[in-house]
From Swiss-Prot:
PTM-bearing positions, type Glycine amide: G34
Modified residues (Pyrrolidone carboxylic acid): Q25
GO molecular function, one term: gonadotropin-releasing hormone receptor binding
Signal sequence extent: 1-24
Main localization, broad class: secreted
Pfam family, one: GnRH
Task of the protein: Stimulates the secretion of gonadotropins.
PANTHER family assigned: GONADOLIBERIN, PROGONADOLIBERIN
Tissue occurrence: Olfactory bulbs, hypothalamus and telencephalon, midbrain and posterior brain areas.
Keyword vocabulary terms for this entry: Amidation, Cleavage on pair of basic residues, Hormone, Pyrrolidone carboxylic acid, Secreted, Signal
GO cellular component: extracellular space
Protein name: Progonadoliberin IIB
Classification via PROSITE patterns: GNRH (PS00473)
Length: 86
């Protein structure tokens, strides 16, 4: 009986120490607990050309894609491969 009590005490102490030395969650830069993010001031000079085209109504990603998704994926992969070889 004494051995069982000592075993529980040792296990409890080990569990307590392991919790104390375990690494806790790291909050990355700009993130706060609860999933809230730091809001940066918007700089209009950082607007990309794609966004400017979208504001003009010429978004390439808004063009409806064909029904054959596999064909689109393969064509994109081939295009990337071709561009890498250039």
């Amino acid at each position: 009986m004494v051995h069982i009590c000592r075993l529980f005490v040792v296990m409890g102490m080990l569990m307590f120490l392991s919790v104390q030395f375990a690494s806790s969650q790291h909050w990355s830069h700009g993130w706060y607990p609860g999933g809230k993010r730091e809001i940066d001031v918007y700089d209009p000079s950082e607007v990309s050309e794609e966004i400017k085209l979208c504001n003009a109504g010429k978004c390439s990603f808004l063009i409806p894609q064909g029904r054959n998704i596999l064909k689109t994926i393969l064509l994109d992969a081939l295009t990337r491969d071709f561009q890498k070889r250039k």
